[in-house]
């Protein structure tokens, strides 16, 4: 339970028997304990035992879903006593028989706690062992469950008692209250055992919106939501630009602080400290870029595309772009030419000529094609494409979008074919483009555009760097630094 970030402070123990678990509770620093016991003789013993412990309450009643009176079957082995008649239990344990039956009060747990003046907020853990009547008791404890973080419940795979709930029934009920079963043990028989349920753990990504730009945030969002879905956890994160643009589950201004931390330093599966580790990481705050080879995200393609559907004024902008593209006489090829901060390392500048070579081949099949250019330095690249009908953001109605990059991103998702940069921005747009059947990207060491599958490729190609190839794929700033470095090395070796 501790691995889920849960450290109980108050316990409700239903089916207390002799209350021997008190030592375990005290050892773990739990002060507030409420015992509920239906057997009058056992309840009396509990009251005597804990009479000098004011933080222990003993309630005599059979926990159920209704107030009333019911028959309680006391067996020769009193731990098997139950509201329900023996069934499979009689076959498995023939020496244990019903010794006698008595009438007891049945009551909802919620009502019993109110009667005794127990603050629901003081109870965050429930232990329940009432011989097949667990679901009845849970149905009467729905208010109490609101504050509970974990439950340990006796479960049945067969009806040991007539009409008793099976483990699947318990799972279904508690799932409706946002609990999941995380551990099950059956040490004595395959027909029954104990299960630990915890409130669906949260996992977070506090780096989302803080670590990199829009596309980095987009991949962080994809990761935390796909990981949470795989593990059946609840994702939490801050607000980010995608909250305005997409049909996402929005972030919160102050997400909860989670006790566990995990930093992802790898880019591929083989380097990842997360994707190859089957160990669950509940109550964990993840940080990293999570730009894995995208087959990792493929099983969740439908969910991702649903979350990343444009909404509001961004959906309207998409409609404007769609109308512009549909008005052209042929297919529209959306291209992304990243300049600005590119020109060093793996973020090389792909020359316009690589795109022109590819377009000239494509135009043989589609002579009426048009080219939409998305670029952070449009004036520097536009003239190279003068031989083609060109489209840019300037051809669209003016807008006052809060996120000025959104028009180009949306346009990239609408292309009939798509040529990207070695950029997570246009790669992410390719993942959302459902129209195109042809995607190409610049491959540095081959100095050309090559086809790729957006849902089965590395987000960034890292095999070569701009400095390895030459100045034509470097920025002026990077070239200057490179020349300075070479000159400095030359002096050093000359001096030596």
Each language-model region and where it sits:
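Phosphate/nucleotide-binding beta-alpha loop and adjacent structural elements of enzyme active sites
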Residues: 1-202
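A short beta-strand-loop structural module common to alpha/beta enzyme folds
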Residues: 35-39, 233-243
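Secretory-pathway luminal glycosyltransferase catalytic domains
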Residues: 204, 240-368, 467-479
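Nucleotide-sugar donor-binding patch of glycosyltransferase catalytic domains
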Residues: 427-496
């Amino acid at each position: 339970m501790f691995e889920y970030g849960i450290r109980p402070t108050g316990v409700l123990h239903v089916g207390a028997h002799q209350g021997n678990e008190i030592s375990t509770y005290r050892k773990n620093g739990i002060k507030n304990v409420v015992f509920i016991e239906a057997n009058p003789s056992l309840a009396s013993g509990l009251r005597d035992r804990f009479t000098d412990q004011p933080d222990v309450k003993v309630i005599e009643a059979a926990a159920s879903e209704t107030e009333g009176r019911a028959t309680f079957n006391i067996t020769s082995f009193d731990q098997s006593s139950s509201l329900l008649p023996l069934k499979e239990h009689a076959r498995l344990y023939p020496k244990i028989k019903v010794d006698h039956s008595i009438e007891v009060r049945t009551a909802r747990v919620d009502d019993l706690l109110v009667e005794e003046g127990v603050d629901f907020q003081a109870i965050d853990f429930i232990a329940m062992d009432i011989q097949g009547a667990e679901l009845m008791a849970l149905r009467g404890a729905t208010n109490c469950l609101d504050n509970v973080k974990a439950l340990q419940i006796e479960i049945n795979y067969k009806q040991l008692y007539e009409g008793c709930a099976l483990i699947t029934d318990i799972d279904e009920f508690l799932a409706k209250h946002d609990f999941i079963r995380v551990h099950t043990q059956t040490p004595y028989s395959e027909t029954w055992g104990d299960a630990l349920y915890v409130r669906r753990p949260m996992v977070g990504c506090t780096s989302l919106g803080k670590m990199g730009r829009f596309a980095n945030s987009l991949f962080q969002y994809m990761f935390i939501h796909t990981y949470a879905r795989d593990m059946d956890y609840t994702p939490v994160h801050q607000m980010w630009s995608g909250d305005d643009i997409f049909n996402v589950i929005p972030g919160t201004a102050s997400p909860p602080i989670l006790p566990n931390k995990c930093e992802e330093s790898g880019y591929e599966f083989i380097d990842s400290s997360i994707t190859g580790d089957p160990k669950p990481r509940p109550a964990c705050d993840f940080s990293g870029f999570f730009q894995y080879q995208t087959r990792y995200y493929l099983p969740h393609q439908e969910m991702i595309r649903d979350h990343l559907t444009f909404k509001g004024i961004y959906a309207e902008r998409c409609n404007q772009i769609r109308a512009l593209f549909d008005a052209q006489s042929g297919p529209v090829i959306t291209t992304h030419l990243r300049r600005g901060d590119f020109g060093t390392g793996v973020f090389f500048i792909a020359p316009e000529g690589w795109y022109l070579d590819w377009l000239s081949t494509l135009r043989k099949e589609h002579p009426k094609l048009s080219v939409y250019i998305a670029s952070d330095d449009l004036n520097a690249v536009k003239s190279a494409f003068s031989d083609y009908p060109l489209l840019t953001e300037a051809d669209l109605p003016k807008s006052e979008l809060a996120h000025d990059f959104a028009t180009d991103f949306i346009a990239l998702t609408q292309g009939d074919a798509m040529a990207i940069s070695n950029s997570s921005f246009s790669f992410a747009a390719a993942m959302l483009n459902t129209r195109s059947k042809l995607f190409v990207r610049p491959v540095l060491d081959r100095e050309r555009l090559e086809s790729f599958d957006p849902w089965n490729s590395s987000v960034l190609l890292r095999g070569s760097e701009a400095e390895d190839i030459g100045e034509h794929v470097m920025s002026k700033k990077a070239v200057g630094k490179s020349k300075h470095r070479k000159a400095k090395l030359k002096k050093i070796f000359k001096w030596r």
